Amino acid sequence: MAMWPQSGMLTTGGRAGMQSAALAAWVANTKPGAQVFYLGPDYEMGRSTVAAFKAAAEGKGAKSVGELFAPLDNKDYSPFFGQIRSGKPNVIYTSVAGNDTVRLFSQMAEFGISRSVQVVGASGTVTGQNLAAIGKAAEGFVTGAGYSTLIDSPENKKFVAAFKAENKTDPDLYGADSYGVLFFYKAAVEKAKSTDTDKVRAAMRDLK
């Protein structure tokens, strides 16, 4: 749970800083002193997600060897590949998402960019919605997502089965987060024994 005291806002969803810290720790353990090239989409979320991971990674000894931001709905990533190769990274971090990920990963595989480089990225980069379209080009990709359908617990297995029965697809990170918000609110109401806003807010602060 994350909280912004000034506004009284609480959230059950993972934040870029949390996910970046976990992913940066993994990179530090597997690629000590990593040479990282950053490639993101050119808008606020893309840039802020890159910045969050960059700060976490450099805090653990990684070094930046380049940074590029592509326009949204970019069709051709090959013009960026020369600069990526020149940087000689052993890790590429990307915050590209959606259909852009399909094109990026397919083109990185086609041009041999991802053959000898570890590709890591934001939680929304490879999801259940675009994984089939990306196919084998997604193999080896690592992210710091806060949810997976593969979590081995009775609660998650029950959730995945119920979600799939209702929606005909597995839950992704956003489906799990949405469920988490409702479950969190329900638990707070039960703890407060009330739906009064102030009482529920107070109960939320103590929930684990």
Residue ranges, per PLM feature:
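Extracytosolic ligand-binding ectodomains
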Residues: 1-208
